[in-house]
Amino acid sequence: MGRKDHTNKTREVAAQLAADGWIEARRGPGDHVQYKHPIKKGRVTLDRGAKEIPTGTLRSIYRQADWKW
């Protein structure tokens, strides 16, 4: 089975969210930022203080953003 390479860099994921139409809705405690989409339901929370995102957290972000893993 082939491995899909998903970027786990915080800046790149933030750029992907912005490119998909997600807008910064609010800043949470510490370096956490919540993104909101004008059409899609829910919010995506991203820790902007970390350089890399753990795989499980990244997968959760993909689910919240309604992206295919």
Regions found by a protein language model. Give the residues of each.
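Basic nucleic-acid-binding interfaces
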Residues: 1-31, 36-69
